[in-house]
């Protein structure tokens, strides 16, 4: 593909991204108008009412306000570093309706009761005329960056204040900016990579003897060497449980033998946290731009803010910043001496900031951030020889170009047979926005790709179906875990169809129920059976053994409404009380990158037409069925699901295992 053609392709990407931006913004607007605060609270998108804590200036001299969640503390929330938020108040009428709705919810055990009973008309919800940005979240405590002039609006409010997620304009604008830069690039490394990534021209390689890594398996060792040989691009394709992170950490370590510093990015904060933690465990000096999602002292110590505040010059800088703020508040005496003093203080503050940042960045070997975080002003003007992008198969191409503009070569790692990027616009999806940079390069530059071929997570029979269906049978199971299980003579995979299960006989089976655009679908009978089957399996294992060996469980459903209903059922069933810390309940997306000893999946869909909605996204199901180490239990109506060839093959595979 010529230079003109690569530019045309990226211009098309920009048009598709614009469609997605408009679709997501419109969907957010409609959701905000249609959904009451009570439903947003239950979805984890809002906290209300807040307890407002202290305000302070952070290391970037931004005003930060501490707020605390006071209700629904058992609800998993969606607030994390970098997300935009808006504060609001409710009228007395709105507060009264929330109270009534919560009472109704407790009575009928319905996860949508709040949503059905709380009106969200404009007269009841009063949004404050500014936005904030989440800086830090730890359980029910959140720190939000807010405009200093609006702090009193929150702190002195006579009525309770709440906070909810707002539409994320920043991420889109950052991606649009990245595309504009790469389209405009001429005669530089970015222009070279742009043209290379849209052509079949072979990527360039170094030539030197392969290195040995006896602690890695053969495909992992090959992947590390391919990364070291790559002048332009290398791709690590890591199916579930194959040690992708282990391989990347080794490759980063070896790269740092040749380069002074590398940039490591991922689509999500959680993935950045994970690889950063593994690098820290190997003794690498990591500087984390942004705050971690999982708060622990080890990782907090590697964040930019903590490093900045721990610097010996920070107390002096803090005192100067305070003096500047106090000087600005003076209403009298703003003469020439005032301006001279202000300029001296500003100059000294800038000098100290530069010195502190130079030392912090000079000491770090790895700079870690999300893809959007790579546009942070702290990185402005910084160049890297190599950028590593993990989760590359979950990131829009435009997002990958954000860190790419800072580097000479790129290492992509991920699995395009697992979760794809989320695209809400049907037109954008049809136009190809969902096809990632990694997926495209796998197609046109297969010699740059290394498939990791040995998995260390699952019983061989759990992995076999996924290996055959998605990876051409190339992924094998490590001998040491090939036949591990919880119980002797246990079948590692089972499928129960609610209407065909003897103990239910289908008599109390209600099938699927549609509960609104934002909640999706729910199947109460299947949810009850899911927990019944889990309880039966726990009884087979034995309570004491589960507690002693910390046997953990993941309960997965593709539908958020079913997840919420399952959480409620577990919290109300006394049998599971001793095991609460061992049981996680979440959507498929929420379990990406995780694993459990036991996984039980509630499929939800149950109709005569064989309609399965987004269960047709087989990459999502690949994630679901590959989370289990030793036991996988599937609950789903076979009459509905097996009309689709994938589920028919999966069901037949499981039946063959049963003999």
Regions found by a protein language model. Name each.
Residues 258-260, 268, 282, 358, ...:
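Conserved helicase motor core of SF1/SF2 NTP-dependent helicases
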Residues 1-81, 101-116:
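A helicase ATPase "motif cassette" and its flanking acidic/Ser/Thr-rich regulatory loops
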Residues 200, 206-208, 253, 261, ...:
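Conserved P-loop NTPase motor core of helicases/translocases
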Residues 247, 251:
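Hydrophobic positions on the alpha1 helix immediately C-terminal to the Walker A/P-loop
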Residues 241:
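Walker A (P-loop) phosphate-binding loop of P-loop NTPases
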Residues 244:
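Conserved lysine of the Walker
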Residues 236, 264:
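Hydrophobic anchor at the beta1->P-loop junction of P-loop NTPases
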Residues 2-14, 76-226, 281, 299-322, ...:
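Pre-ATPase regulatory/linker segments immediately N-terminal to the P-loop/RecA-like helicase/translocase core
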């Amino acid at each position: 593909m010529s230079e003109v053609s690569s530019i045309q392709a990226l211009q098309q990407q920009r048009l598709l991204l614009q469609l997605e931006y408009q679709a997501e913004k419109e969907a957010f607007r409609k959701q905000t108008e249609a959904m009451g605060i009570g439903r947003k609270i239950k979805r984890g998108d809002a906290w209300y009412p807040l307890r407002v804590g202290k305000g302070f200036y952070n290391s970037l001299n931004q005003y930060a306000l501490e707020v605390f969640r006071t209700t629904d503390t058992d609800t998993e929330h969606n607030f994390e570093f970098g997300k935009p938020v808006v504060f609001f108040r409710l009228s007395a009428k709105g507060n009264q309706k929330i109270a009534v709705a919560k009472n109704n919810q407790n009575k009928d055990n319905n996860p949508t009761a709040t949503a059905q009973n709380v009106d969200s008309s404009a007269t009841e919800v009063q949004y404050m005329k500014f936005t904030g940005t989440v800086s830090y979240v730890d359980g029910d405590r959140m720190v939000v960056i807010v405009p200093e002039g609006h702090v009193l609006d929150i702190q002195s409010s006579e009525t309770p204040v709440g906070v909810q997620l707002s539409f994320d304009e920043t991420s889109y604008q950052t991606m649009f900016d990245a595309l504009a830069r790469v389209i405009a690039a001429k005669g530089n490394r970015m222009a070279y990579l742009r043209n290379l990534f849209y052509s079949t021209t072979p990527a360039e390689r170094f030539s030197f003897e392969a290195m040995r890594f006896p602690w890695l398996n053969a495909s992992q060792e090959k992947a590390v060497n391919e990364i070291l040989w790559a002048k332009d691009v290398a791709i690590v394709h890591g199916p579930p449980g194959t040690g992708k992170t282990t391989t990347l950490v080794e490759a980063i370590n070896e790269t740092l033998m040749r380069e002074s510093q590398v940039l490591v990015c991922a689509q999500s904060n959680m993935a950045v946290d994970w690889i950063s933690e593994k690098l820290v465990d190997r003794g690498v000096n990591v500087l984390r731009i942004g705050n971690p999602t999982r708060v622990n002292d080890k990782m907090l110590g590697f964040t930019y803010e903590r490093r900045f505040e721990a610097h010996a010059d920070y107390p002096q800088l803090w005192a100067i910043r305070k003096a500047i703020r106090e000087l600005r508040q003076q209403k009298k005496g703003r003469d020439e001496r005032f301006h001279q003093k202000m300029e001296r203080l500003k100059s000294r503050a800038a000098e100290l900031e530069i010195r502190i940042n130079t030392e912090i960045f000079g000491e770090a070997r790895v700079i870690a951030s999300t893809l959007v975080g790579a546009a942070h002003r702290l990185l402005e003007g910084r160049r890297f020889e190599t950028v590593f992008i993990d989760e590359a198969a979950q990131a829009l191409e435009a997002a990958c170009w954000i860190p790419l503009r800072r580097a000479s070569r790129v290492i992509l790692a991920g699995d395009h047979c697992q979760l794809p990027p989320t695209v809400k616009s049907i037109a954008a999806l049809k136009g190809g926005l969902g096809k990632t940079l990694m997926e495209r390069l796998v197609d046109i530059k297969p010699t740059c790709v290394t498939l990791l071929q040995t998995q260390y997570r699952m019983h061989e029979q759990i992995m076999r179906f996924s290996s055959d269906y998605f990876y051409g049978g190339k992924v094998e199971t490590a001998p040491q875990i090939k036949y591990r299980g919880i119980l002797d003579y246990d079948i590692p995979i089972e499928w129960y169809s609610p209407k065909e299960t003897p103990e239910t006989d289908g008599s109390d089976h209600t099938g699927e129920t549609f509960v609104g655009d934002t909640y999706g679908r729910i199947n109460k009978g299947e949810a009850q059976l899911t927990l019944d089957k889990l309880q039966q399996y726990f009884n087979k294992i034995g309570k004491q053994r589960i507690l002693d060996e910390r046997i953990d469980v993941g309960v997965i459903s593709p539908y958020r409404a079913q997840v919420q209903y399952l959480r409620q059922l577990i919290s109300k069933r006394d049998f599971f009380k001793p095991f609460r810390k061992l049981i996680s309940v979440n959507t498929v997306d929420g379990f990406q990158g995780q694993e459990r000893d036991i996984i039980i999946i509630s499929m939800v869909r149950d109709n005569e037409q064989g309609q399965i909605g987004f269960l047709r996204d087989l990459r999502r199901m690949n994630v679901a069925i590959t989370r289990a180490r030793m036991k996988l239990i599937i609950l789903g109506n076979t009459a509905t699901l097996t009309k689709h060839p994938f589920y028919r093959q999966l069901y037949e595979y499981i039946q063959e295992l049963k003999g």
